[in-house]
Amino acid sequence: MTFTINNTNSTVFDSTNNENMTISEPVQPVSKGPKGITFSGETFIVPETHDMVKTLFDPTVKKSNFELIILSCLFSNLLVFLISNNQIRIYIFIALYIFWRLSYNFGIGWLLQNQSNHNLLVSWSQKYHLFDPENKGALAQSIQNEIKSQRGENYDIKSMPVEFNTWLIFRKFVDLILMSDFITFCCVVFCSAIKDDYQFINNQSSWLVYSRIVLGSGLILFNLWVKVNAHNTIKDYAWYWGDFFFRQINNEELIFDGVFEMVPHPMYSVGYVGYYGFALIAKSYVVLAIAIFGHFLQMIFLHYIENPHIDKIYGPSKNEINLIKILKLKDLKNFDNLKPLVGLTNFNWMRASDIVNLVLSLTYGIIIPLFANSIKSLFILTVGMKLFESISINLSLTLQSYFKIVTKWSLSNDIPVEKSFSNWAVLYNSLINLTYSSLFGMNLGYFLQKSGSDSPSSGLLFSDWFYLRVFLGLLLIYTQFWINFSIIDSIGYFGWFYGDFFIPKSQSSIKNITTAGVYRYLNNPEQIFGVCGVMGIFLIYPTVENFVCVGLWVVNNFIRINFIEKSHMVKLYGEQEVNRDSGVTKTVKKHLLPEVIQRRMSNDEAYTRINGTTHGRRRRSSNLHRNSVADSLDNFIRDLRNSSTKLSQQKLIELSQNLSFANSDYKLTIDGLKMQSTESDELKYTTIGTPVTVSWTSPTENHSVRDWIGLYKIVQTSYSRNKTILSSAGRWTWCKEPKGSFIFDKEKLFWEEGVYEFRYHLDGKHDVAYISEPFEIKSIELKVPEFKEDAIKFAENLKLEIFDKVIKLTDISEAISPIANQSDNVIEVYKLISSMISKSTKINITYKIFLNQGDDDLLSIKDVAIKLINIKHVLEELSYNITDKKDV
């Protein structure tokens, strides 16, 4: 059944997919009811119709000729019960069910496919003039009589389009096949349940029997609610595939309301859970098998018949399809324009990382289990791998979210963010592969060791219902695969590998949180379904080891989604955007919660939006604990950022200034130092690379030409105030005259931040005569501008404050490398410049930024300035203020 939406606000019919359609005048007077239009452009008023249950089983509704035939066919199934052998009855009903199921999926499917592609059924009607009153043929007369018996004697067949009349006849074939399919299935259920003296209530404990019946009945009732809700939503038009024959004006879009907002294709997915409820009540693997058989054929019907027609009628236009293709190709630019490895999908023999993943997966999944001595060792390996993966991935994402460690490291080494993200994707996928390979290997080892023993079921927590466990386990494993690929289809590889943590929104094709695909129905589909495959493995092999692994997988998944991923998404897109109701939540609120509770929840949410936090963030009661934990983490990180371990300035002064020098005849004064503030205990300072002039005075009678001054770090000399036992490493000068001065610059300076002092030494020895006041060498603060238009001014500041202190360039456009290559050690020069830039701008870069210049080696100061602006732009887009979380 297809499903459409009634868009009452639309007044223009969208014929994007039917370019040749023209609209003619209605063929009958306008009356109440929806307006239809055929694919040839003929418009008409669609008369009211009834569903098959009301049509066939409501005694107040007059039955048509075909409907009487259908009822006769349905009741004829009772003749089978005249056979006394119940097993033969089961075989007969199974054969009948298979016949009707094949008639449904392949018979109706073939008719619908040809109607969609070739207008086959309508062409037949026109070819044989089935609705022409002048046609006196037996077939035409019987079909016309059938329509009149449906619509009444006053129904004017000729006034209605052939398409609509053909649809009315097609409906009766659908009624016959669908009702016969369901009735024969119910007969199989009944016969299977009562065989062997009502086996469905025997040979089991009472609690288990009641549990089966209650759970099975619940599935059946839920199935019934799905069908009723679906029919109330899409009406007869879509229930009977009306859009294969004509269109209803203002029904140009797919509907996502009611149960259609809860799960994708509910008529084909959860619309069959009742079949499994019947199997549970009947306690029959036969019923389970034919339920799986019928459901499988229905999914084939959906894939090959329903979906192609939906895409044809309601799908995107050619331009939209091309746009989608382009976006998917853009998604691959982060992965060298190749689909990245996900598990072992998209494997490429030409990628070294793929080969390594394959080797590791085979090693941990097959080779190690073949040679392992015990299951315990495999269990320890699996737990160890999962803990390693959980801690490393969660810690990496947390640090990237708050501190951008991966991005900063990459940009500092002049590595594009796309490349760093690609490397992260390889690491992430490799660790995930190792965990699942280890889990598979543990269970393979268990199978190999137990299969040869006398009691293969020993060690299992339970060993009953093996085939049921295998079916449910494989179903859960398949569900995880399906969910994972659905997630990738919705958010791309960018979203799958947490691209929001690494790539700024301006450089990504994803600007907002998606609500398409599987995310239309669930906000976090991977919350449960992302690990349900591990639960499936536990069902197949219910060992203690697998139970522990399920716990590890679930806990890690919960922490990663709720405390890392969701926290980052809230700060990036806003809490209201992230916490919007999913389709399932909307459906539960609308259809399954009492109205009084709905009003209360609506009032609570409205109150919270108005009287919530100072930032206007919406909170829900179920999120209070999680938010409080997340806020505690934020507070901890904020305190960590704001904390410092600097020694007090007064303590530094006490360490530096030896009071015994207060009345000394020797003096040292430092010229050109700057004051940090007006407070007396604040150290004077200079900036890195700025020459420092020191003046000395010594008594003439005691002066020696071998007196000398050295520059030292206080933290290295504070333990010895009267004698220096540390080398000055070349940062010294002779004091040949009793009075004089000397400029410390270039190699005689420390090119790093810290607190320093000058020491006056006597007669070429290390005896200290005087220690200067302490002073601080600190980085100049340079603000990186927001826009590239300010790059020239910023480059001038870089040249003045940093480059001119190391190398001499004539202007900001001159190439750096030719001048730097003239130095004795060009790498050290680059390291020094990059260090000064990093400290001055608070943007970390490494010397490699000067090496990745291309073939022309024309990197200039202006180019460096532009690179810094770009890096700042990337980091700011990925960052947020912890104390002021973003809200939308």
From Swiss-Prot:
Location within or outside the cell: Endoplasmic reticulum membrane
The EC number(s) this enzyme carries: 2.1.1.17
Lumenal topological domain: 1-63, 113-173, 227-261, 306-354, 399-423, 492-527
Pfam families: PEMT (PF04191)
Topology versus the membrane: Multi-pass membrane protein
Entry keyword annotation includes Disulfide bond: no
GO cellular component terms, A-Z: endoplasmic reticulum membrane; plasma membrane
Keywords, alphabetical: Endoplasmic reticulum, Lipid biosynthesis, Lipid metabolism, Membrane, Methyltransferase, Phospholipid biosynthesis, Phospholipid metabolism, S-adenosyl-L-methionine, Transferase, Transmembrane, Transmembrane helix
Pathway, per record: Phospholipid metabolism; phosphatidylcholine biosynthesis
Cytoplasmic compartment spans: 85-91, 195-205, 283-284, 376-377, 445-470, 549-888
Segments crossing the lipid bilayer: 64-84, 92-112, 174-194, 206-226, 262-282, 285-305, 355-375, 378-398, 424-444, 471-491, 528-548
EC main group: transferase
Record's keyword annotation contains Nucleus: no
Any one Gene Ontology molecular-function term assigned to this protein's record: phosphatidylethanolamine N-methyltransferase activity
Function statement: Catalyzes the first step of the methylation pathway of phosphatidylcholine biosynthesis, the SAM-dependent methylation of phosphatidylethanolamine (PE) to phosphatidylmonomethylethanolamine (PMME).
Family in the record: Belongs to the class VI-like SAM-binding methyltransferase superfamily. CHO2 family.
PANTHER family: PHOSPHATIDYLETHANOLAMINE N-METHYLTRANSFERASE
Protein name per its UniProtKB record: Phosphatidylethanolamine N-methyltransferase
Organism: Candida albicans (strain SC5314 / ATCC MYA-2876)
